């Protein structure tokens, strides 16, 4: 049976959901093929969305028309701002989610979206003609024709689950691996490697002794992810903190020989920033304890996820380990921890649109590209979906720069550097993080969303008014000169503010931590009518004014540098500071400008600086 659509999406995880929904929203006829409709949107690992860097991604996905933020706001159990005591650039919103509610909400959204159809089957191979994808075949002899195909298979490509010595060919515990498609992708000549990730055991809530455990609350004023969320008054359940101890560690050490991670059974490389408990005990042998969070999986609190105890140790060892931990002495394990090893394609095989270089019309998103995490997957799925539609319409691709969004950092890192371990987003990966804050996501990306048809016109008009108000009032504050006159000192004293001893502008005054929004409105009458969103931006811009201006200068310099032409016949060999790999790639592709050089996989900003210097030196000589 042959069926046709504009875009096919393979896989109903977090990347597949965003790719399907955004493409349908932009007017394409989309068909989603997934192994099990009931697992669309399943949170396979921890019951949480967001965090440091990840919260930024979630909010960016939301502004650009994605669904993760609104689903989370409708299914959360606890909401917090991480790093709340630090600067706004490194704060991250995080929510514990009800895994059942999240999955049901996501599934219903997918099933009720116009232009989007869904079928339950397994994709087995791609149909390729003249190096262009034209469709797929499935395990029930269906053939689907499409102009674009987006693969979002997660950990299912040749997936193997490990629990102790036992191995099963699963893409997730109890679910079949996708072996035929994995073989097909290898046969097409893609550079395929193996990665490993893992998950933690879950225990029955009524078997935990919470007495004496540290209770972890949500924020009094809970943050939310989606700008569309109104009247937010969510459930706030507690999490609990406990710790491993020397007895726990000895049990694990005594069973290192039975751990797939150390026995050679697992070959794939695991996530650096989410190591298994056996890896932590091995690498940090001097530590006497490791922190664990007991997180409710649903509002019913019937199961708790033991965050920090990812493991693939044998079942009997997992029992001993858990029962050695305070509060879990009599815990009943409902689901054991396991490791999963799977195929991924080196993301250097992709362009910035997430289309493969080898096969036209084929896009990859999510863990197939070597990332880890729901948020990283959602961001890639969204971008693949948008770009697949734009390609259908013969319109220019949508590529976010590193100075525009964490999504830009994520994709640029993947396609230029590749990865040999599961890639996770952190704020430290963004060199322009002062400009890429959670609080200014709407102002950064609203114009893009509106242009793509992913933001309502009325809302965008209000956003533009706010943006203009921010710029105009910052200018006014810079021009507003304050002197230590009697009137100024009196007004500062009334606001319980320290006096000024010298001349200063309004921006410098508002840079004070103590000068809150209420004081801003009181001291500067022209700020009084402005809404909270505008005043918050003005406050942050004033506080970090010097650093923000410096980052804008660096961006301008980089933009100017990328316009520099590389002379015809330029010799790259022998330039100090250029690695052999960089020289080989530059000689092979012969870029005509530094911008073209920056698009080559493996060419770093440091390489561009060196090239810029030597082009300048050779021109002068």
From Swiss-Prot:
Disulfide bonds: none annotated. NAD(+) binds at residues 270-284. FAD binds at residues 11-16. It is found in: Cytoplasm. The keyword Cytoplasm applies. Transmembrane segments: none annotated. The keyword NAD applies. Its main location: cytoplasm. GO terms for molecular function: flavin adenine dinucleotide binding. Belongs to the MnmG family. This is tRNA uridine 5-carboxymethylaminomethyl modification enzyme MnmG. The gene is mnmG.
């Amino acid at each position: 049976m042959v069926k046709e659509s504009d875009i096919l999406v393979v896989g109903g995880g977090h990347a597949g959901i965003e790719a399907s929904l955004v493409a349908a929203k932009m007017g394409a006829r989309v068909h989603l093929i997934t192994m099990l409709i009931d697992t669309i949107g399943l949170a396979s690992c921890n019951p949480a969305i967001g965090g440091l860097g990840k919260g930024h991604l979630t909010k960016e996905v939301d502004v650009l028309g994605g669904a993760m933020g609104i689903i989370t706001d409708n299914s959360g159990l606890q909401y917090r701002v991480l790093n709340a005591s630090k600067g706004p650039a490194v704060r991250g919103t995080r929510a514990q989610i009800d895994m059942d509610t999240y999955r049901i909400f996501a599934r219903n959204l997918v099933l009720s979206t116009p232009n989007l159809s869904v079928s339950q089957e397994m994709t087995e191979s791609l149909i390729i003609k003249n190096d262009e994808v034209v469709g797929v075949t499935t395990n029930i002899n269906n053939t689907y024709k499409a102009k674009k195909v987006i693969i979002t298979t997660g950990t299912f490509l040749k997936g193997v689950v490990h629990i102790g010595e036992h191995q099963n060919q699963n893409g997730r515990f109890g679910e079949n691996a996708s072996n035929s498609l994995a073989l097909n992708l290898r046969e097409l000549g893609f550079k395929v490697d193996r990665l490993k990730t893992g998950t933690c055991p879950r225990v029955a809530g009524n078997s935990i002794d919470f007495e004496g455990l540290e209770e972890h609350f949500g924020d009094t004023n809970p943050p939310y992810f989606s700008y569309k969320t109104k009247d937010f008054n969510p459930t706030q359940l507690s999490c609990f903190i406990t710790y491993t101890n020397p007895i726990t560690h000895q049990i694990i050490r005594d069973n290192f020989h039975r751990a797939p991670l150390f026995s050679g059974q697992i070959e794939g490389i695991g996530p650096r920033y989410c190591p298994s408990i056996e890896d932590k005990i091995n690498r940090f042998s001097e530590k006497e304890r490791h922190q664990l969070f007991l997180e409710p999986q649903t509002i019913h609190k019937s199961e708790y996820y033991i965050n920090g105890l990812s493991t693939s140790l044998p079942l009997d060892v997992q029992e001993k380990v858990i029962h050695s931990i305070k509060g879990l002495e009599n815990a009943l394990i409902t689901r054991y921890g396991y490791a999963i090893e799977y195929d991924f394609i080196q993301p250097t095989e992709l362009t910035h649109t997430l289309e493969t270089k080898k096969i036209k019309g084929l896009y990859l998103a999510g863990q197939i590209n070597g990332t880890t995490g729901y948020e990283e997957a959602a961001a890639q799925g969204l971008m693949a979906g948008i770009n697949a539609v734009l390609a259908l319409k013969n319109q220019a691709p949508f590529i976010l720069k590193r100075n525009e969004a964490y999504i830009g950092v994520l994709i640029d890192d993947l396609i230029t550097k590749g990865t040999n371990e599961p890639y996770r987003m952190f704020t430290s990966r963004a060199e322009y993080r002062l400009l890429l804050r959670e609080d200014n996501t709407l102002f950064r990306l609203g114009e893009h969303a509106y242009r793509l048809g992913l933001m309502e016109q009325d809302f965008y008009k209000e956003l533009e008014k706010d943006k203009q108000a921010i710029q105009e009032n910052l200018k006014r504050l810079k021009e507003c000169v304050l002197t230590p006159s009697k009137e100024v000192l009196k007004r500062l004293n009334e606001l319980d503010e320290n006096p000024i001893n010298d001349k200063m502008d309004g921006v410098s005054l508002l840079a004070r931590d103590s000068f809150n929004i209420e004081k801003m409105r009181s001291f500067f009458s022209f700020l009084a009518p402005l809404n909270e969103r505008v005043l918050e931006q003005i406050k942050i811009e004033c506080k970090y004014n010097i650093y923000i201006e410096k980052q804008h200068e660096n961006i301008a310099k980089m933009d100017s540098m990328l316009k520099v032409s590389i002379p015809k016949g330029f010799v790259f060999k022998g330039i100090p500071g250029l690695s052999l790999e960089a020289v080989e790639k530059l000689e092979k592709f012969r870029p005509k400008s530094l911008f073209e050089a920056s698009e080559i996989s493996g060419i770093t900003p440091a390489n561009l600086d060196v090239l810029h210097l030597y082009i300048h030196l050779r021109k002068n000589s």
